[in-house]
Amino acid sequence: MNELNIIKQYGGAYIDSRDVAEVIGKRHHHLLRDINGYIKIMQESTKTNFGFSEFFLESSYFDSTGRELPCYLLSKMGCEMVANKLTGAKGVLFTAAYVAKFNDME
């Protein structure tokens, strides 16, 4: 399993969605699709006061050809949301990895 790296930015701590995708064995564009679905549900719900930016921050990166591509920065709550949708060994390992990383910062 690859190491999760904490990114300290915007006054918080985050993990890049590319790292999350690699750790959970999911293609990055599939994880982006899932995150976009979570965001859509949160935005459409009138029963909650959740701002999706508490979970996911839109970001981007440049690939090896110089193209700018989308990614997300996941807060601890964003990691928890992704982890709660996973099952089996990958879910357990990802949960253990992000909990350890964020707890190291406290």
Short names for language-model regions:
Residues 1-106:
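An anion-engaging/catalytic patch
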